[in-house]
């Protein structure tokens, strides 16, 4: 019975659940020893194994094992050794091997190792003497694999009680592992490249086998270290010995033959075979890793350049499909082999002469090092370019060129120093893309014209070049690619873009483009919205609206259309506005888009210029009031059709309505809004139209027409198409977005790409992981994706949230899908939302294209490298604890941030923030910083001049003696201040001239403070006070003129007892909410006379407050005839009920 049987028996024993963890560790230790012994014994046919006592120590160890088993259980042990009995049977027969006896056996092993390690040395037997038929590259690699597998076991053990725990030597063992892996790859590389018989290179394979066996024997003899009482060598001495063994590359294998001589010989032979080995590829990152690992440092600038290029080559080859370099394999083989010859030759020259110069190297090798590096540069550039291109996102937005041009202007202004050496090239590229913009516009608006195929091909090429430009500029700013490579890359992009433009011109598509653009803009009647040709739905709605526009009342009428986002109200309005049968009935047509944030003057300019048919430049210096008067006079005698799109508030309509005179000539205004209240407010005669959802057949017709144009969908794809249309949940904008993505895919491959995985909302079928899914993975909720897409930012690959927690947990827990490892492969990820599914302990700083990132994080600080995400516009990080999260000052280098949400964060270095960081001019929402002092808040406000919404905690640990006015940005509209406990008075007055929403929580307040503060808040519409103490008198007096615009007042958990309100203090108040105001005596009687009041809610308050609320209701409804008024009483405070009972 051999040792292998014992090993097999031990492995099967590990399956027995009756063994304790200590027992299993003991068995694993024995297995570890036996695996090494087995491998050493396989080398018995080689003379070097006998010469260096490798066989002797192995045979002795086997005898120790045999004698130990026989001494413990003589009868059963013999049967076990012969293979007739299992270890499990031994256990069941209660012939137990105690831990003490095995502990003694371990000490015997250790002493035996010490005895042999004192005599062990590198074998001196010549390489020629070890040439035997058994040594093949496959055999060498198998031996190295066993050594690597066994050493990996030691590296991974972190349990201090384990017999294989060796913490002091892990670093050295990892070095040994790296040497063995690189040696194994070198063997594979040579064997894979040679066409000639492998036996011709046995010297190299023998050397590799001896080297691997020697270093493995050295490790085995010194590890694992037994208890300190039995250890002759200190851990530091063992570490030094292992380090010496790792440095074997500088030792001679035998007199006159060094390791480098052997490598040089095999590489020179290999170089001769390259022309005949064109079908075998050398483009593997492993061989480049070997060369990089072997580099000597400090010889010259040229050697530093060579090292840099080899590192770049290695890093990019990892991500490169070999098919993309099939025509350059011979060149790459030559480059890699030449680099290897150069590096290993340097060692020999360096060893013979201490003060080696560059001239010595060139003369000795016959090289001109600077000139020889040039071909390597060419290959490095080619590999980097191909590695980028093969990872380009396959969703190509035709609006991406607009996005790029905006970014280029932004780059040149913001990073002028970094881009100085590329300035001329970037300006040329910018000019070329501006010339091509009209062509792309036609591709978007006329996808089915006579140049359809050519236009699509050219457009895709242009967009790919745009991606490359962005990547190159980013790399320049981040210094990720050397300058020589960037310059060459941009020059190639210029030449390729010029070729694309020439191809377009050759087919006269540029002339057609210009004619089309002129036609589109020359006449109001020809104004066709982008989605006009897809109006295949809402036929009943269109007919209804057409009738309202052309018939009905003689007076002016407003046709209001309202719906949720994405239903197509803007497209529908544009369809009516550009309908010839409608437009021909009006003298003047004009339109404007209001949106949530608008400029009154810009709206007037847009309407006036449409009305008079002139450009806006000549009127830009005119005051807004004069423009409004000019527009009114222009419209007064004429019948007009006005389109006012995307109105968010009543006030926006109030700004414009005075410009539209009513002279009973059937003038019409089309108004679109998301809000029913706005639509109702703007209506005159006609009732607002609430736009319905799509019917299923309308969804399919839109998708089919958008994707296939005038063609019909093939039967093969129709089933997939119907399912896609259904999953878009009857939203036109969803359908158009999905259709645009499908157009960018090859239609024939839509089914096999499993495109449904992109958009399926409620359920995702678990599938095996594959490269194809990796490329297109998008776990997304369509609403959120749509909201992001319509904001104007390009969405590339998306890894988004999903509402099937079980699926995501299994997805993220599997070994092939570790989130931290897979994310770097999505190089072009723009949107990443992990907030609801997984807690992460890292920030994906290797994704520079991210625009949106949301996650739940475990750590208490953010790394400074987060500034690598310099394109980020939205950052949402939520912690798993209530501790303050430290934010590095480098966040202030992320100048594109518009939305920053990190609960309870504090700047890490306030001084650096003040002195060095730029302003975040684009930041509009900031939530939730923690400020210990008022001065900290002032500092943050100076760095964020354009805030519109701020939520923060101000602890105010240091208080000034008098009120301090804290000036907020002029644009600020929403402000929420809170503290954890109402222990002190708020130490500052709030000055925010345009503030509309204010919430204060956790402070002492008094009438004086509130009076002084509200003097700075004349536009306040919503005031909410939570957990507020009202000082010793518990009184709040509100005088006239303090809250002229307040509409909503909410008071919750206040200590307020006496509330005195002047008659006109809240002239337009609509809602009053009182929660848990148990000490308040009553609601002031002046609320009976507020005619705008619509709603009062009382919860957890005493009977007197409820009684006063009912009195107000009676007066409002009966006396004031306020039919819209509503009183809601949830419950009376519990102690009032007990007292009354």
UniProtKB/Swiss-Prot annotation:
Pfam families: NB-ARC, NB-LRR. Residues 417-437 form a coiled coil. One of its GO terms (molecular function) is ATP binding. It is found in: Cytoplasm; Membrane. CDD domains: RX-CC_like. Belongs to the disease resistance NB-LRR family. This protein is encoded by the haplotype B genome of the allohexaploid Solanum demissum. GO terms for cellular component: cytoplasm; membrane. One of its GO terms (biological process) is plant-type hypersensitive response. Its main location: cytoplasm. This is Putative late blight resistance protein homolog R1B-13. It comes from Solanum demissum (Wild potato). Residues 516-742 form the NB-ARC domain. Keywords: ATP-binding, Coiled coil, Cytoplasm, Hypersensitive response, Leucine-rich repeat, Membrane, Nucleotide-binding, Plant defense, Repeat. It is a peripheral membrane protein. Confers resistance to late blight (Phytophthora infestans) races carrying the avirulence gene Avr1. Resistance proteins guard the plant against pathogens that contain an appropriate avirulence protein via an indirect interaction with this avirulence protein. That triggers a defense system including the hypersensitive response, which restricts the pathogen growth. LRR repeats lie at residues 826-851, 869-894, 992-1016, 1017-1041, 1043-1068. The keyword rRNA-binding does not apply. The keyword Transport does not apply.
């Amino acid at each position: 019975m051999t040792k292998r049987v014992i090993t097999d028996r031990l492995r099967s024993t590990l399956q027995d659940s009756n063994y304790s963890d200590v027992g299993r560790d003991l068995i694993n230790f024995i297995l570890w020893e036996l695996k090494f012994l087995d491998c050493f014994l396989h080398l018995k046919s080689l003379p070097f194994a006998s010469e260096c006592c490798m066989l002797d120590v192995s045979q002795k160890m086997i005898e120790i094992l045999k004698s130990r088993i026989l001494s413990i259980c003589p009868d059963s042990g013999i049967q076990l050794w012969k293979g007739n009995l299992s270890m499990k049977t031994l256990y069941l027969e209660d012939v137990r091997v105690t831990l003490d006896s095995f502990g003694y056996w371990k000490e015997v092993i250790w002493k035996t190792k010490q005895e042999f390690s004192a005599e062990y040395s590198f074998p001196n037997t010549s390489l020629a003497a070890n040439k035997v038929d058994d040594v093949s590259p496959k055999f060498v690699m198998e031996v190295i694999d066993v050594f690597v597998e066994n050493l990996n076991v030691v590296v991974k053990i972190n349990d201090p009680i384990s017999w294989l725990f060796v913490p002091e030597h892990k670093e050295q063992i990892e070095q040994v592992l790296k040497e063995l892996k690189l040696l194994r790859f070198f063997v594979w590389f040579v064997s894979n490249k040679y066409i000639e018989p492998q036996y011709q290179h046995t010297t190299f394979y023998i050397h590799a086998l001896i080297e691997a066996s020697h270093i493995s024997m050295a490790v085995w003899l010194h590890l694992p270290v037994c208890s300190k009482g039995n250890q002759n060598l200190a851990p530091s001495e063992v570490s030094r010995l292992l380090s010496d063994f790792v440095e074997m590359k500088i030792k001679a294998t035998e007199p006159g033959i060094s390791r480098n001589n052997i490598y040089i010989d095999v590489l020179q032979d290999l170089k001769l075979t390259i022309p005949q080995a064109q079908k075998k590829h050398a483009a593997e990152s492993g061989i480049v890793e070997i060369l990089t690992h072997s580099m000597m440092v400090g010889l010259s600038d040229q050697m530093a350049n060579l090292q840099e290029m080899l590192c770049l080559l290695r890093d990019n080859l990892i991500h490169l499909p070999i098919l993309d370099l099939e025509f350059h394999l011979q060149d790459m083989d030559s480059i890699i082999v030449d680099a290897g010859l150069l590096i290993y030759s340097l060692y020999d020259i360096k060893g013979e002469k201490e003060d080696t110069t560059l001239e010595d190297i060139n003369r000795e090798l016959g090289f001109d090092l600077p000139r020889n590096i040039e071909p390597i540069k060419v290959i490095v550039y080619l590999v980097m370019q191909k590695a980028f291109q093969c990872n380009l996102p396959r969703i190509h937005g035709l609006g991406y060129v607009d996005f790029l041009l905006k970014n280029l202007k932004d780059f040149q202004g913001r990073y002028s120093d970094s881009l100085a050496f590329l300035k001329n090239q970037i300006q040329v590229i910018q000019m070329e893309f501006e010339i091509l913009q009209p062509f792309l516009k036609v591709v978007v608006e006329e996808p089915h014209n006579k140049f359809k195929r050519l236009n699509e091909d050219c457009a895709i090429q242009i967009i790919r070049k745009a991606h490359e430009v962005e990547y190159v500029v980013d790399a320049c700013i981040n210094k990720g690619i050397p300058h020589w490579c960037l310059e060459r890359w941009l020059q190639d992009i210029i030449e390729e873009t010029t070729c694309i433009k020439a191809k377009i011109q050759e087919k006269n598509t540029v002339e057609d483009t210009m004619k089309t653009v002129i036609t589109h803009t020359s006449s109001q009647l020809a104004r066709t919205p982008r989605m006009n040709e897809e109006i295949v739905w809402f036929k009943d709605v269109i007919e209804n609206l057409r009738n309202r526009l052309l018939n009905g009342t003689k007076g002016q009428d407003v046709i209001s259309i309202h719906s949720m986002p994405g239903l197509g109200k803007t497209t529908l309005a544009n369809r009516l506005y550009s309908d010839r049968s409608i437009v021909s009935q009006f003298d003047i047509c004009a339109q404007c888009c209001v949106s949530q944030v608008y400029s009154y003057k810009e709206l007037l300019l847009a309407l006036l210029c449409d009305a008079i048919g002139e450009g806006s430049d000549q009127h830009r210096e005119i005051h807004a009031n004069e423009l409004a008067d000019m527009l009114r006079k222009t419209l007064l005698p004429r019948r007009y059709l006005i389109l006012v799109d995307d109105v968010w508030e009543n006030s926006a309509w109030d700004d414009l309505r005075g410009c539209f005179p009513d002279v009973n000539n059937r003038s019409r205004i089309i108004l679109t809004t998301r809000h029913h209240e706005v639509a109702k407010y703007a209506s005159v005669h006609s009732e607002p139209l609430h736009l319905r959802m799509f019917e299923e057949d309308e969804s399919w017709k839109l998708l089919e027409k958008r994707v296939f144009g005038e063609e019909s969908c093939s039967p093969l794809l129709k089933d997939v198409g119907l399912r896609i249309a259904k999953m878009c949940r009857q939203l036109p904008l969803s359908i158009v977005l999905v259709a645009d993505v499908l157009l960018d895919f090859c239609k024939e491959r839509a089914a096999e790409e499993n495109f449904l995985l992109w958009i399926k909302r409620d359920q995702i079928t678990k599938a095996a992981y594959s490269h194809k899914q990796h490329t297109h993975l998008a776990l997304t909720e369509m609403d959120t994706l749509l909201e992001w897409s319509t904001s104007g930012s390009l969405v590339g690959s998306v890894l988004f949230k999903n509402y099937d927690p079980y699926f995501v947990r299994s997805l993220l827990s599997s070994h092939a899908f570790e989130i931290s490892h897979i994310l770097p492969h999505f190089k072009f990820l723009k949107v990443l939302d992990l907030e609801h599914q997984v807690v992460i302990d890292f920030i994906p700083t290797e994704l520079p294209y991210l625009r949106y990132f949301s996650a739940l994080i475990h750590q208490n600080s953010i790394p400074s490298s987060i500034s690598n995400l310099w394109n980020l516009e939205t950052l949402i990080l939520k912690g798993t604890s209530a501790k303050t999260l430290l934010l590095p000052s480098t966040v202030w280098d992320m100048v594109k941030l518009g939305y920053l949400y990190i609960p309870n964060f504090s700047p890490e270095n306030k001084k650096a923030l003040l002195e060095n960081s730029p302003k975040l001019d684009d930041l509009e929402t900031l939530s939730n910083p923690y400020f210990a002092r008022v001065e900290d808040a002032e500092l943050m406000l100076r760095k964020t001049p354009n805030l519109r919404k701020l939520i923060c905690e101000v602890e105010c640990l240091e208080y000034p003696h008098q009120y301090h006015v804290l000036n907020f940005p002029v644009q600020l509209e929403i402000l929420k201040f809170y503290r954890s406990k109402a222990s002190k008075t708020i130490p500052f007055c709030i000055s925010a001239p345009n503030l509309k929403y204010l919430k204060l929580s956790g402070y002492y307040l008094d009438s004086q403070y509130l009076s002084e503060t509200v003097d700075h808040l004349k536009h306040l519409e919503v005031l909410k006070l939570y957990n507020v103490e009202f000082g010793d008198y518990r009184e709040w007096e509100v005088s006239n003129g303090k809250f002229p615009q307040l509409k909503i007042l909410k008071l919750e958990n206040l200590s307020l007892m006496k509330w005195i309100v002047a008659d006109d203090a809240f002239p337009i108040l609509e809602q009053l909410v009182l929660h848990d105001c148990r000490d308040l005596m009553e609601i002031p009687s002046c609320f009976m006379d507020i005619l705008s009041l619509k709603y009062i809610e009382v919860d957890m308050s005493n009977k007197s407050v409820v009684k006063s609320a009912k009195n107000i209701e009676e007066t409002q409804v009966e006396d004031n005839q306020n039919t819209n008024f509503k009183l809601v009483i949830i419950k009376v405070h519990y102690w009032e009920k007990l007292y009354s009972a």
